[in-house]
């Protein structure tokens, strides 16, 4: 049997404890601070509210109406409501005193009304004289205004976006002069001849890329800039100018920036080299070629004078070091690499005449045994139709052509299974195992009109 747990009694809240213990003075400090809003969080909010004011923005824990203007969707502008107050006539309010009558009459007394001018008195018994008149002229009013000066102005604005091409006026005849006239082709009959313009190269070779970004080249100082009158020419003979020029200007600095950058110096005492006196800047190096050789150049700036304002005035110096001279090219007599005689070179030509060839032997030095390949002469067969072969390989070497031996291509057996004969009834010089073969040289330079190539060649003649 499961025992029932006792019901947990709810603890009194801080507000309930404050009501019972405040009178007796036994309330804990945290209960008093929480109820009276004296905690650190409440104090921070109270101090911050002294400097900020969010009234009228609808920020709070109310009904969520969004303030007086309501919520505005994102990406839209709030609608503007204009309050129009109806016009009312002004009402004059008269104060009523204690001595004034309580009943106000609607009609004023006649004695108070001002009648204005007096009534005229007529004398005599004749009465009034009645006069009648008649006229036939119509009553026409002259409504013509007085003469005035009228100025009429007109302005014409041409907008190329709203001009129809057929409406464009054809240009006049161009002037025959050295100028280039570029016009827009229009409709209609022209008084001149339209010649299409072609692109031509004025500067350069004409092979410069025009449709893509070219590879940026290296910026080099032109020779006339280095050897002009604006620069003082100084020749340097110390090799330290190539890799460590700071030793020629100031004391040796172990933390060297590099020889391929612009070096700056502060004008100090005496320089180790008198040619580098008062140098404040030494620009990056440049290699140039002269008639005498290859030259290593640097531009330097001196600060010989300095004004009170701090402006440095000095000459610009061109320091150069000749690396290597360029000697005149010696004329070397050219020797032929190969001779024209048909000497034995250790290779076997399958198209050579076998009767004129000698046995091929391969010899090696040392203990390696030698091997000899004997070649047996055989009768050569020629076709009835022969043709001369001419291969334009050049005039340097003479290329001899000979008729080759009999070549037997592989053929499939007529019966199956195929039993090879032993020994073979026909003895040939060369056997080809496979479908690869060497083409006759005359077909190397023949223009191909079709993709068909003869399957094989025998004895230098085409097998039809």
Curated annotation (Swiss-Prot):
Localization per Swiss-Prot or TrEMBL:
Virion; Host nucleus; Host early endosome; Host Golgi apparatus
Name this protein carries in UniProt: Minor capsid protein L2
MF terms from GO for this chain are:
DNA binding; structural molecule activity
GO cellular component assignments: host cell; host cell endosome; host cell Golgi apparatus; host cell nucleus; viral capsid
Does the keyword section mention ATP-binding? no
Domain of life where this protein originates: Viruses
The UniProt entry annotates the motif Nuclear localization signal at 1-12, 445-453
Per the similarity annotation, which family is this?
A: Belongs to the papillomaviridae L2 protein family.
* Keywords, alphabetical: Capsid protein, Cytoplasmic inwards viral transport, Disulfide bond, DNA-binding, Host endosome, Host Golgi apparatus, Host nucleus, Host-virus interaction, Late protein, Microtubular inwards viral transport, Phosphoprotein, Viral penetration into host nucleus, Virion, Virus entry into host cell
Q: Which InterPro entries match?
A: Late_L2
List, in alphabetical order, the GO biological process terms annotated in this UniProt record: microtubule-dependent intracellular transport of viral material towards nucleus; symbiont entry into host cell; viral penetration into host nucleus
Chief location category = virion
The entry's function note states: Minor protein of the capsid that localizes along the inner surface of the virion, within the central cavities beneath the L1 pentamers. Plays a role in capsid stabilization through interaction with the major capsid protein L1. Once the virion enters the host cell, L2 escorts the genomic DNA into the nucleus by promoting escape from the endosomal compartments and traffic through the host Golgi network.
This protein's assembly is summarised as:
Interacts with major capsid protein L1. Interacts with E2; this interaction inhibits E2 transcriptional activity but not the DNA replication function E2. Interacts with host GADD45GIP1. Interacts with host HSPA8; this interaction is required for L2 nuclear translocation. Interacts with host importins KPNB2 and KPNB3. Forms a complex with importin alpha2-beta1 heterodimers via interaction with the importin alpha2 adapter. Interacts with host DYNLT1; this interaction is essential for virus intracellular transport during entry.
| Disulfide bond entries | 21-27
Cited HAMAP family: PPV_L2
Q: Can the keyword DNA-binding be found in this entry's annotation?
A: yes
Q: How is it modified after translation?
A: Highly phosphorylated.
